[in-house]
Amino acid sequence: CNQAGHCLHQADWLLGRLCGQFGFSDENNALKLGYDVIQRCWPDWLHTLDIPLHLLPEVVPAGQPVGALAEPWRDRWGLSRDTQVLAGTTDSTASFIATGARPGEAVTSLGSTLVLKVMAEQPVFAPQDGVYSHRLGDRWLVGGASNSGGAVLRQYFTDDDIERHTAQMDIATPTGLDYYPLPATGERFPVNDPGLAPRLQPRPDDDARFFQGILEGIAAIEHEGYRKLAALGAPWPTRIITTGGGASNESWRTMRARLNDIPVTAAAHQDAAYGTALLARKGST
């Protein structure tokens, strides 16, 4: 720490390089450093730690201008002197913005893990349940992340297998297998249990039925996740927008829509770069 000039995230480093001055961060990245996003300040308990507080950045809302683009970059890219540099956000928040989700709607990311976020009027923080909130404008993204997800499918199936078994599934007839798919022991949300073991038995002889059972299990975890968020004070989603590799599976979306009794759609846009561009456009107007 004696040789450090700033405490920063990767996004903060890029921000500093672009505007020629370091020492700024956005509220979404700063949350990971312990920033109090409700009171919008660094908490008092940081004073009890052996941390030079002058290293901590000045925190601003995501999308807020922090300065002009530095002259070397303006010259290199042929941009005007009026070009502003805006505070960024985390990749997951940018992906949420990219979907165009509205207040009360949720985004489920079906990647290697299962990540849920719902846009709410009030924040929810329940670390014992793996639940946290990111500030986004005058609203909040309340969410949690399960260890379940596509990583489990990859342990058993190739892309060709998934395509073939999806066509063979009979989603009108649930398997009743009651799986809790995990890639390894341990879960964090909606059940916070480091000792929770995967439940993938019994395994039927029919691989398509086994595949369907795993999808049903992940869908059930998603359902319980939104129930957990609602029990803690978040709204029940009016719609679930899906991102990640599992978003394109229409049969899975239908299964999840029936279980949650709300529309489940695939996101038209989900790239973090697109969401960041939308954030910048809003912040610069």
Label each region the model flagged.
Residues 1-10, 15-21, 32-50, 71-241, ...:
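Active-site core segments that coordinate phosphate-bearing ligands/cofactors
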Residues 24-29:
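Nucleotide/phosphate-binding loop and acidic/charged catalytic motifs
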Residues 38, 62-69:
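Short beta-strand to alpha-helix junction loop
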Residues 48-64:
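A conserved helix-loop-beta module that forms one wall/lid of the active-site cleft
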